[in-house]
Design a protein with these regions (language model features):
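Polyanionic, low-complexity intrinsically disordered segments
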Residues: 1-48, 55-59, 191-251
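Extended low-complexity intrinsically disordered regions
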Residues: 22-51, 151-177
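Helix-loop junctions and short alpha-helical segments
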Residues: 58-196
Length: 251
């Protein structure tokens, strides 16, 4: 193991020396100029590593399998948390987070599908159903107003615009979920929307009315309530993911 570390260290030093020789040919090892160049190389490498990490993260946001794995991991973590007695406030927060996991999975999946031209064109065609008039105007603008107003909008810019609009949407309403995906998906599907309707209502009461429902009755969240919510969301995501992955595979 030690020899392998030494080999990697030597390779890193060689790459550093090559970079310095190319960018600072007059710098000699042991001089302040060489030390400054070595420090700049180190900063450059750190920046490259961070950029690569960010690029991988952004790519994962447009991958439905990655988003499914992330959602399942979040629910597993919540389930582990609920194996032990928790303060009431933690149980309430865990319940709310179940809906957040559902919301984010649907949003990122919808966003990911927009990378496919046929799906993007469907979004552009039905934009009036999803966004405000001013947002639709900017979305469909034939000029690339974000970068070069005199240039025609490239295809990828339409993708970015549509994805930005979807990223602002919330899928915490069963009617919104039904309207969006019934319009956008070509794959036949029947999702258990009724199962999440009550869960979302309780979530909204916890978030917006401090645990009081529309009938002005208090809502009590228990360990069992959270476990049921986790199971409900997990089941819905599994059913939805099957459809979304089939849709993704069409393109």
């Amino acid at each position: 193991m030690g020899s392998m570390k030494e080999l990697l260290f030597e390779m890193q030093e060689e790459r550093r020396d090559e970079w310095i020789a190319e960018n600072y040919p007059d710098a000699e090892e042991g001089t302040p100029e060489w030390d400054a160049a070595a420090q700049e190389y180190s900063w450059f490498q750190d920046w490259m590593d961070e950029a690569a990490e960010q690029q991988c993260f952004e790519a994962s946001l447009t991958s439905i399998p990655d988003r499914l794995q992330d959602a399942k991991a979040e629910l597993d973590e919540l389930e582990s948390l609920m194996q032990f007695n928790q303060p009431r406030i933690v149980e309430r927060m865990a319940y709310v987070h179940c809906v957040s996991v559902l919301d984010s999975f649907l949003m990122y999946s919808a966003r990911a599908l927009l990378s496919h031209p046929p799906h993007l064109h469907r979004f552009l065609q039905h934009a009036s159903s999803f966004v405000r008039k001013d947002e639709k105007r900017d979305l469909l603008n034939r000029k690339w107003i974000e970068q070069e107003p005199e240039v025609d909008t490239p295809e990828q810019a339409y993708v970015w615009r549509a994805q930005a609009l979807v990223a602002k949407m919330t899928f915490q309403n069963h009617k919104t979920i039904s309207r969006y995906f019934s319009t956008m998906l070509t794959t036949p599907h029947e999702w258990p929307l009724q199962e999440i309707e009550g869960l979302i209502k309780i979530r909204n009461a916890l978030v917006h009315r401090n645990g009081v429902n529309e009938s002005l009755e208090p809502i009590y969240i228990s360990q069992g309530s959270v476990q049921i919510a986790i199971s409900t969301v997990r089941n819905f995501i599994s059913v939805a993911a099957e459809t979304l992955l089939q849709e993704d595979a069409l393109y």
